[in-house]
Design a protein with these regions (language model features):
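Conserved beta-strand/loop scaffold segments within soluble protein domains that form the structured core
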Residues: 1-244, 258, 262-291, 295-296
Length: 296
């Protein structure tokens, strides 16, 4: 996709099937792709979207710049899934802007399984009685760099948001997370939570995290936090004492670390496929998505 996509779901329309868009980079020379996605979900509508980025010709430099805009009208439900499994020669800059109206529900899930250099930015404006979930999963190795930045603005009362981002970094990979929650003075009875958990699987991997919380109203429930650590040596010792090889024990612990993120996915096909891909990725095997319609 080199241009743009406009998806309009009319009032009251509830789509049962997932809309999937697959971008495959198959260039024989360095390339740049600029794309824009606009999603408008009407009142009391429902839509699920799955965007996938894949590379067919490895080693060809490519740059992707994309902007995604989501408008969720009153009572609408929008699920947006973004899966990136590209080559180390690929760089991607992605910005997502979402605006929710009263009583709407929005889920945004961004997964980076492989890339070169990726930066994802999320900006979400939350109205009254809305529910918002923002989830991110990153697995990076080599000299890959993955940054995620999120800003969730609660502008009205009785809204809920949850942010959860997890990273597994190995070799000399670099990760970054900058997450912000802002609760305005008129946003009483807001509940907003943010969590960033990171696992460094090598001595040279680095993670930079900066959770932020701004509250201008008293009657709220909010929390934020971040933690970065390494594999539990006691758990590794226990597993090895039970005859499990070290590499397999490490892979099992890392898979377990990501399992709750995968559990949040409400697309059964995508959830099963991600379990398969994460297992292959952490096992050092080539990613193979297979048939694209499997995830829907």
């Amino acid at each position: 996709m080199q241009d743009g996509v406009f998806i309009h779901v009319a009032d009251g329309v509830r789509l049962e099937k997932t809309i999937q868009i697959v971008n495959i980079f198959n260039a024989s020379a360095p390339m740049m792709a600029v794309r824009r996605v606009l999603v408008v979900a009407g009142r009391d509508s429902q839509v699920r979207l799955l965007f996938c980025d894949h590379t067919q010709n490895a080693g060809i430099d490519s740059l992707v710049s994309q902007v995604v805009e989501i408008s969720a009208a009153e009572g609408a439900t929008v699920d947006y899934y973004d899966l990136e499994a590209t080559d180390s020669a690929n760089s991607r800059l992605s910005q997502l802007y979402a605006r929710q109206q009263r009583g709407s529900r929005l889920t945004v899930n961004g997964t980076t399984l492989s890339c070169g250099h990726t930066r994802n930015e999320y900006v979400i404006a939350v109205a009254d009685r809305c529910d918002t979930e923002l989830v991110g999963m990153v697995i990076a190795d080599g000299d890959q760099v993955v940054d995620n930045a999120s800003s969730v603005f609660h502008n009205a009362d009785h809204s809920h948001s949850r942010q959860t981002f997890k990273y597994i970094l190995s070799d000399s990979a670099r990760g970054g997370f900058e997450g912000a929650i802002r609760v305005d003075a008129d946003a009483a009875f807001t509940e907003a939570y943010q969590t960033n958990r990171n696992l460094l699987a090598s001595e040279d991997a680095r993670m930079h995290t900066a959770p932020q919380l701004e509250i201008y109203c008293d009657e709220v429930k909010c929390s934020h936090g971040a933690a970065t650590g390494q594999l539990d040596q006691n758990a590794l010792f226990y597993m090895r004492s039970r005859g499990i090889p070290l590499d397999e024990a490490r892979r099992m612990l890392m898979e377990s670390f990501m399992s709750d993120i995968i559990d949040t996915i409400r697309l059964d096909g995508l959830q099963d496929r991600l379990r398969h891909l994460v297992e292959r990725r952490l096992g050092g095997r080539r990613l193979d998505c297979g048939e694209c319609n499997t995830c829907k």
